[in-house]
């Protein structure tokens, strides 16, 4: 779960940066290939959706998103198998469920970004900080 969230954090950060940099026309060597014409050396796209499409059509980024989706599937399968824990593990299970809920939010930000740039950023930032908080809380039970 942790590695999937870390990969999602990296992907969602790039999504944010491409989205933002296209809107504000900020030059950045990491985002320019997606936000500017002529493979990053031309004009900025008028529509940020073109920049996001470029990112999501990038072969390397597609691989990263594919891995995150595979991780989501694996983690969901494990969580499904953890039903009805013994009483002695109830607190740990509750902490894990909280962590899983935030994990789903942060990975969804990477796999299926929605809303406006502001709402996406808010959702992502909250999920990112909550994941660390819930991960630390769950770590007590390791």
Question: What are these model-predicted stretches?
Answer:
Residues 54-70:
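Mid-length scaffold segments of soluble, non-membrane domains
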Residues 65-87:
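Amphipathic, heptad-repeat alpha-helical segments
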């Amino acid at each position: 779960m942790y590695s999937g969230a870390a990969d999602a954090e990296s992907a969602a950060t790039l999504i944010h940066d491409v989205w933002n940099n296209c809107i504000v026309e900020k030059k950045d060597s990491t985002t320019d290939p997606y936000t500017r014409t002529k493979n990053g050396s031309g004009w900025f796209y008028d529509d940020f959706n073109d920049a996001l499409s470029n990112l999501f059509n990038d072969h390397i980024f597609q691989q990263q998103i594919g891995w995150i989706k595979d991780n989501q599937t694996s983690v969901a399968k494990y969580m499904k198998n953890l039903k009805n824990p013994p009483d002695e593990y109830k607190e740990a299970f509750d902490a894990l469920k909280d962590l899983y809920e935030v994990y789903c939010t942060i990975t969804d930000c990477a796999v299926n970004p929605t809303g406006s740039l502001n709402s996406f950023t808010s959702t992502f930032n909250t999920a990112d900080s909550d994941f660390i908080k819930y991960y630390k809380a769950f770590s007590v039970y390791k």
